[in-house]
Amino acid sequence: MTEKHTEEEILFIKLCKGLVEICDRINRGEPAYLVNDYQPFPQPLYEAFEQLSIKWILRDEKMRHPSILNMVEAARHSVEAVEPDFCQWVDFPDEPLIEDMIQPSEECEDFASDYSLSLEIDNNQSYILRLMDEIKKYDLPLQTYTIFRRFIAENPFPSEFDQALLLDKHPEIERVKDLLEEAYQPAPPQSHDMGLCKKCGGYLDCAAREINECCEPLEQKVDKSPIIDTVYCLIRPSLIELRLAKIIKEMGLEVELWPELDKADLKITFPDGKIWAIDAKDWGSATRLARKLNQDKIPDIGQSQSFFVVPDYRLKKLQDQAIFKSKYQGNIEVISESELIKRIKKELK
């Protein structure tokens, strides 16, 4: 289900996307601003500033920030410092969107991921939907989607041999090979010294630092690394899904990842034929997650029960838990990983 965004929220998403791109440039050893370029700043950041400038002049009769550089500096102080109206979208408006000068905050990353996932933003077709369209266009088996996504999730730094092996084992992937290449970029020569996580491909000192099994440093030089959208939109969200699939499969149950072109994250089939549908969710903003889930649903894949499942470590944060519970109004039950496993065990008795 496509999430509905207000114009104000789209502005904030563009801002966050632009800030993330600037931080990524810095972390890759590139200039944050391309001084001699026609467009020195990331396009989403430029668009956010342009639209905010109109808003400020109409509302305040003056510019709140005279330049993009000033706006970026404000983002290092707090969300409220950038624009007070943005406070409604975040859990902690008095905290910065850029931490330690060069790292996007967890909430900033969370909103930035929507730029690549949402069709509503400037008709920007999401990578995942383009993959689905290509699979339908070439009449490929639906399992192609699962194979493709799993490869990316498990291979943040694939070698040429890894990709050749994938194509040899699954020749149907050849039809969507260009999209596979699009998920990666050439790694900088200093990739092994950049503080990249070998699990997700993101930066070690980043918003993924609390993700289970993440933040293990990359120790060898690599040829390819995932683009930042791949990290946020494909790899990190898949960590909980792959983790759950492994545990449930070891319990002797049939588990299907991303069934029927991602109608759910997990389809669990019990020995008696009963089916549960799981949509696994991680978040950087409890406010944003609640708003998303209030609009979300899990389509029919033959299930008798549906659950939204979140990582255990998220629910250990009582403040996040309180924020989420106060804002979630949906009908689908939201439970933790460990609670899901507990219920599966009970169902098997």
Regions found by a protein language model. Give the residues of each.
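Nuclease-adjacent, charged terminal/linker segments that flank catalytic cores
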Residues: 2-221, 227
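Active-site beta-strand-loop-beta-strand hairpin of nuclease catalytic cores
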Residues: 15-19, 55, 267-277
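Catalytic cores of nucleic-acid endonucleases
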Residues: 84, 281-330
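Acidic-basic catalytic patches of nuclease active cores, encompassing PD-(D/E)XK
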Residues: 190, 218-260
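Generic recognition of long tandem-repeat/solenoid scaffolds
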Residues: 209-213, 246, 266-268
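Conserved beta-strand segments of alpha/beta enzyme cores
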Residues: 254, 331-333
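C-terminal structural cap/anchor segments
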Residues: 259-265, 278
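C-terminal helix of von Willebrand factor
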Residues: 333-349
